[in-house]
Amino acid sequence: MDEVAYDFEVLGPSEKDPETNDVLLVATRSENVEQRQAAVSAAGLTPKIVDVEAFALENACKLMQHQMPDGGIDRTMAVVDFGASSTTFSVLRNMKVIYTRDFTFGGQQLTEEIMRTYGLSMEEAGRAKKEGGLPGNFQAEVLDPFIDDMTQQVSRSLQFYLASGSGREQPEKILVCGGCANISGVADVIASRVGISAERGDPLGTMKLSSRAKAQAVARDATALLTACGLALRSFD
Protein backbone atom coordinates (compact mmCIF):
# COMPACT_ATOMS: atom_id res chain seq x y z
CA MET A 1 0.00 0.00 0.00
CA ASP A 2 2.99 2.31 0.37
CA GLU A 3 3.17 2.49 -3.44
CA VAL A 4 -0.49 3.39 -3.87
CA ALA A 5 -2.22 6.76 -3.59
CA TYR A 6 -5.94 6.50 -2.98
CA ASP A 7 -8.96 8.43 -1.83
CA PHE A 8 -12.64 7.72 -1.35
CA GLU A 9 -15.97 9.46 -0.99
CA VAL A 10 -19.21 8.13 0.47
CA LEU A 11 -21.89 8.67 -2.18
CA GLY A 12 -24.88 7.81 -0.02
CA PRO A 13 -27.37 4.94 0.37
CA SER A 14 -27.16 2.27 -2.31
CA GLU A 15 -30.11 1.85 -4.66
CA LYS A 16 -29.64 -1.93 -4.50
CA ASP A 17 -29.46 -2.08 -0.70
CA PRO A 18 -30.55 1.09 1.16
CA GLU A 19 -29.01 -0.25 4.37
CA THR A 20 -25.54 0.11 2.84
CA ASN A 21 -23.71 3.05 1.28
CA ASP A 22 -22.13 3.32 -2.14
CA VAL A 23 -18.50 4.37 -1.88
CA LEU A 24 -16.40 5.77 -4.70
CA LEU A 25 -12.78 4.62 -4.45
CA VAL A 26 -9.99 5.96 -6.65
CA ALA A 27 -6.47 4.53 -6.60
CA THR A 28 -3.29 4.95 -8.62
CA ARG A 29 0.41 4.36 -8.25
CA SER A 30 2.05 6.95 -6.00
CA GLU A 31 4.59 7.77 -8.70
CA ASN A 32 1.77 8.98 -10.98
CA VAL A 33 0.78 11.54 -8.37
CA GLU A 34 4.37 12.48 -7.57
CA GLN A 35 5.19 13.14 -11.24
CA ARG A 36 2.29 15.55 -11.53
CA GLN A 37 3.11 17.25 -8.27
CA ALA A 38 6.67 17.77 -9.48
CA ALA A 39 5.49 19.24 -12.79
CA VAL A 40 3.17 21.71 -11.05
CA SER A 41 5.84 22.68 -8.53
CA ALA A 42 8.39 23.19 -11.32
CA ALA A 43 5.99 25.71 -12.86
CA GLY A 44 6.08 27.69 -9.62
CA LEU A 45 2.62 26.62 -8.50
CA THR A 46 1.42 24.81 -5.41
CA PRO A 47 -0.60 21.64 -6.10
CA LYS A 48 -3.74 21.49 -3.99
CA ILE A 49 -5.60 18.53 -5.41
CA VAL A 50 -5.18 15.64 -7.85
CA ASP A 51 -8.25 14.61 -9.83
CA VAL A 52 -9.17 11.72 -12.10
CA GLU A 53 -9.07 12.45 -15.82
CA ALA A 54 -12.46 10.83 -16.43
CA PHE A 55 -14.04 13.18 -13.88
CA ALA A 56 -12.30 16.18 -15.44
CA LEU A 57 -13.57 15.15 -18.87
CA GLU A 58 -17.12 14.90 -17.57
CA ASN A 59 -16.85 18.44 -16.21
CA ALA A 60 -15.32 19.73 -19.44
CA CYS A 61 -18.14 18.27 -21.51
CA LYS A 62 -20.46 20.83 -19.94
CA LEU A 63 -18.51 23.39 -21.98
CA MET A 64 -19.32 21.52 -25.21
CA GLN A 65 -23.05 21.16 -24.69
CA HIS A 66 -23.56 23.73 -27.44
CA GLN A 67 -22.21 21.08 -29.84
CA MET A 68 -24.53 18.30 -28.62
CA PRO A 69 -28.12 17.52 -29.62
CA ASP A 70 -30.40 18.85 -26.86
CA GLY A 71 -27.29 19.85 -24.94
CA GLY A 72 -26.56 16.19 -24.29
CA ILE A 73 -29.58 15.82 -22.00
CA ASP A 74 -31.02 12.29 -22.30
CA ARG A 75 -28.63 11.74 -25.18
CA THR A 76 -25.71 9.36 -25.74
CA MET A 77 -22.53 11.10 -26.86
CA ALA A 78 -18.93 10.02 -27.41
CA VAL A 79 -15.80 12.07 -26.83
CA VAL A 80 -12.37 11.00 -28.07
CA ASP A 81 -9.42 12.97 -26.73
CA PHE A 82 -6.17 12.38 -28.65
CA GLY A 83 -3.15 13.20 -26.52
CA ALA A 84 0.54 13.08 -27.35
CA SER A 85 1.07 9.43 -26.50
CA SER A 86 -2.29 8.19 -25.25
CA THR A 87 -5.93 8.63 -26.16
CA THR A 88 -9.13 8.44 -24.13
CA PHE A 89 -12.45 7.34 -25.63
CA SER A 90 -15.44 8.11 -23.44
CA VAL A 91 -19.18 7.69 -23.79
CA LEU A 92 -21.61 9.89 -21.89
CA ARG A 93 -25.29 9.29 -21.25
CA ASN A 94 -27.24 12.30 -20.03
CA MET A 95 -23.89 14.10 -19.49
CA LYS A 96 -22.52 11.35 -17.22
CA VAL A 97 -19.56 9.19 -18.24
CA ILE A 98 -20.71 5.57 -18.52
CA TYR A 99 -17.71 4.12 -20.37
CA THR A 100 -14.04 5.00 -20.74
CA ARG A 101 -11.22 3.33 -22.64
CA ASP A 102 -7.59 4.48 -22.63
CA PHE A 103 -5.14 3.23 -25.23
CA THR A 104 -1.64 3.99 -26.44
CA PHE A 105 -1.94 6.19 -29.51
CA GLY A 106 -1.41 9.89 -30.12
CA GLY A 107 0.11 12.77 -32.00
CA GLN A 108 3.62 11.75 -30.98
CA GLN A 109 3.39 8.89 -33.48
CA LEU A 110 2.81 11.37 -36.30
CA THR A 111 5.75 13.47 -35.13
CA GLU A 112 8.02 10.42 -35.07
CA GLU A 113 6.90 9.35 -38.54
CA ILE A 114 7.73 12.84 -39.85
CA MET A 115 11.16 12.53 -38.24
CA ARG A 116 11.82 9.15 -39.87
CA THR A 117 10.49 10.10 -43.29
CA TYR A 118 12.22 13.45 -43.66
CA GLY A 119 15.24 13.13 -41.38
CA LEU A 120 14.18 15.91 -39.03
CA SER A 121 14.85 16.38 -35.34
CA MET A 122 12.01 16.06 -32.84
CA GLU A 123 11.77 19.84 -32.54
CA GLU A 124 11.81 20.37 -36.32
CA ALA A 125 9.20 17.66 -36.89
CA GLY A 126 6.90 19.08 -34.22
CA ARG A 127 7.14 22.56 -35.67
CA ALA A 128 6.56 21.31 -39.22
CA LYS A 129 3.52 19.34 -38.08
CA LYS A 130 1.92 22.50 -36.72
CA GLU A 131 3.15 25.10 -39.20
CA GLY A 132 3.39 23.12 -42.44
CA GLY A 133 6.12 23.36 -45.04
CA LEU A 134 6.60 19.60 -45.52
CA PRO A 135 7.16 18.05 -48.98
CA GLY A 136 4.26 17.43 -51.32
CA ASN A 137 4.15 13.71 -50.57
CA PHE A 138 3.44 14.32 -46.87
CA GLN A 139 -0.33 13.99 -47.23
CA ALA A 140 -0.31 10.67 -49.10
CA GLU A 141 2.69 8.98 -47.50
CA VAL A 142 2.50 10.15 -43.88
CA LEU A 143 -0.69 11.98 -42.94
CA ASP A 144 -3.31 9.81 -44.64
CA PRO A 145 -1.99 6.57 -43.07
CA PHE A 146 -1.99 8.28 -39.67
CA ILE A 147 -5.59 9.43 -40.16
CA ASP A 148 -6.48 5.84 -41.10
CA ASP A 149 -4.97 4.70 -37.80
CA MET A 150 -6.98 7.35 -35.95
CA THR A 151 -10.26 6.22 -37.47
CA GLN A 152 -9.45 2.56 -36.79
CA GLN A 153 -8.80 3.35 -33.14
CA VAL A 154 -12.12 5.19 -32.84
CA SER A 155 -13.98 2.38 -34.61
CA ARG A 156 -12.36 -0.24 -32.39
CA SER A 157 -13.18 1.71 -29.23
CA LEU A 158 -16.78 2.08 -30.36
CA GLN A 159 -17.05 -1.68 -30.86
CA PHE A 160 -15.54 -2.35 -27.43
CA TYR A 161 -18.11 -0.01 -25.89
CA LEU A 162 -21.07 -1.62 -27.66
CA ALA A 163 -19.86 -5.07 -26.60
CA SER A 164 -19.24 -4.06 -22.98
CA GLY A 165 -22.81 -4.58 -21.81
CA SER A 166 -26.37 -5.26 -22.86
CA GLY A 167 -28.54 -2.38 -23.96
CA ARG A 168 -25.66 -0.15 -24.99
CA GLU A 169 -26.92 2.71 -27.16
CA GLN A 170 -24.84 3.84 -30.10
CA PRO A 171 -23.61 7.41 -29.63
CA GLU A 172 -25.46 9.99 -31.68
CA LYS A 173 -22.35 12.09 -32.18
CA ILE A 174 -18.60 11.98 -31.60
CA LEU A 175 -16.69 15.04 -30.44
CA VAL A 176 -13.06 14.78 -31.55
CA CYS A 177 -10.63 16.55 -29.21
CA GLY A 178 -6.90 16.85 -28.60
CA GLY A 179 -4.13 18.15 -30.81
CA CYS A 180 -4.91 15.63 -33.56
CA ALA A 181 -8.40 17.09 -33.88
CA ASN A 182 -6.79 20.07 -35.63
CA ILE A 183 -5.86 17.91 -38.62
CA SER A 184 -7.91 19.33 -41.48
CA GLY A 185 -11.00 17.25 -42.23
CA VAL A 186 -10.24 14.50 -39.70
CA ALA A 187 -13.66 14.70 -38.02
CA ASP A 188 -15.35 14.25 -41.40
CA VAL A 189 -13.19 11.21 -42.15
CA ILE A 190 -14.04 9.65 -38.79
CA ALA A 191 -17.75 10.32 -39.39
CA SER A 192 -17.68 8.66 -42.80
CA ARG A 193 -15.77 5.61 -41.54
CA VAL A 194 -17.81 4.89 -38.39
CA GLY A 195 -21.18 6.11 -39.64
CA ILE A 196 -21.74 8.58 -36.80
CA SER A 197 -21.76 12.37 -36.98
CA ALA A 198 -18.44 13.79 -35.76
CA GLU A 199 -17.20 17.29 -35.03
CA ARG A 200 -14.09 18.91 -33.62
CA GLY A 201 -14.73 19.54 -29.95
CA ASP A 202 -14.33 23.10 -28.69
CA PRO A 203 -14.57 23.51 -24.90
CA LEU A 204 -13.80 27.23 -25.20
CA GLY A 205 -16.39 27.96 -27.87
CA THR A 206 -18.82 29.82 -25.62
CA MET A 207 -16.23 31.64 -23.50
CA LYS A 208 -15.44 35.33 -23.78
CA LEU A 209 -11.78 35.95 -24.48
CA SER A 210 -9.70 38.43 -22.57
CA SER A 211 -8.35 41.26 -24.68
CA ARG A 212 -4.88 40.02 -23.71
CA ALA A 213 -5.51 36.56 -25.17
CA LYS A 214 -4.32 35.72 -28.67
CA ALA A 215 -7.54 34.70 -30.38
CA GLN A 216 -5.86 32.69 -33.14
CA ALA A 217 -3.75 30.68 -30.69
CA VAL A 218 -6.74 30.05 -28.42
CA ALA A 219 -8.83 28.82 -31.35
CA ARG A 220 -6.01 26.47 -32.39
CA ASP A 221 -5.29 25.09 -28.94
CA ALA A 222 -8.83 24.98 -27.52
CA THR A 223 -9.53 21.37 -28.44
CA ALA A 224 -6.32 20.24 -26.73
CA LEU A 225 -7.36 21.88 -23.45
CA LEU A 226 -10.23 19.54 -22.64
CA THR A 227 -8.76 18.04 -19.47
CA ALA A 228 -7.38 21.40 -18.34
CA CYS A 229 -10.83 22.96 -18.70
CA GLY A 230 -12.38 20.15 -16.69
CA LEU A 231 -9.84 20.59 -13.92
CA ALA A 232 -10.42 24.35 -13.90
CA LEU A 233 -14.14 23.78 -13.35
CA ARG A 234 -13.56 21.52 -10.36
CA SER A 235 -14.42 22.96 -6.97
CA PHE A 236 -12.72 21.96 -3.74
CA ASP A 237 -12.71 23.00 -0.12
Segments from the language model and where they lie:
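Active-site neighborhood for divalent-cation/phosphate handling
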Residues: 1-65, 173, 203-209, 224-227
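A polyampholytic, Gly/Pro-enriched intrinsically disordered region
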Residues: 3, 68-77, 124-128, 216-229
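Gly/Thr-rich phosphate-binding beta-strand-loop-beta motif of the actin/hexokinase/Hsp70
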Residues: 19, 67-99, 109, 114-117, ...
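Glycine-rich phosphate-binding loop plus the immediately following alpha-helix
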Residues: 31-59, 96-136
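Glycine-rich phosphate-binding/hydrolytic loop that grips phosphoryl groups
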Residues: 56-59, 181, 199-237
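Adenine-nucleotide phosphate-binding core of ATP-dependent small-molecule kinases
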Residues: 112, 116-117, 125-173, 180, ...
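Glycine-rich phosphate-binding loops at beta-strand->alpha-helix junctions
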Residues: 146, 169-199, 203-205
